[in-house]
Amino acid sequence: MPRSTNKGPFVDHHLMKKVDQAQKEGSKRPIKTWSRRSMVVPEMVGLTIAIHNGRQHVPVYISENMVGHKLGEFAITRTFRAHSGDRKAKKEGEK
């Protein structure tokens, strides 16, 4: 069930404070955050936010298309290891 429109978007206070400060200074340095649950708001457009994926901080440049989505959507947490193929079929194809 989606969040009520009466409440508005959720953004952690500490993250919003850093966003406001970066906009005042015109800083291009990435803002480090662990808050994957925060929603992207129009004030963040043009900033680079380093989102934690459980292991490291992934730098993400915020564009207008991202507004309304959660930060966690842009920093994947799982790495895909390809399934091992049929070795016998590979060897026959090489011959």
From Swiss-Prot:
Q: Where is the signal peptide?
A: none
List the SUPFAM superfamilies. Ribosomal protein S19
Q: Which GO terms describe its cellular component?
A: cytoplasm; small ribosomal subunit
The question of whether Transmembrane is a record keyword is answered with no
Superkingdom of origin organism: Bacteria
Query: Does the record's keyword annotation contain Ribonucleoprotein?
Result: yes
Q: Cite a single GO BP annotation.
A: ribosomal small subunit assembly
A Gene Ontology molecular function term for this protein is: structural constituent of ribosome
Instruction: Please report a single Pfam family linked to this protein.
Output: Ribosomal_S19
Q: Which NCBIfam families match?
A: rpsS_bact
Q: Which family does it belong to?
A: Belongs to the universal ribosomal protein uS19 family.
Main role? Protein S19 forms a complex with S13 that binds strongly to the 16S ribosomal RNA.
| UniProt-recorded name of the protein | Small ribosomal subunit protein uS19
Which source organism? Coxiella burnetii (strain RSA 493 / Nine Mile phase I)
Which gene produces this protein? rpsS
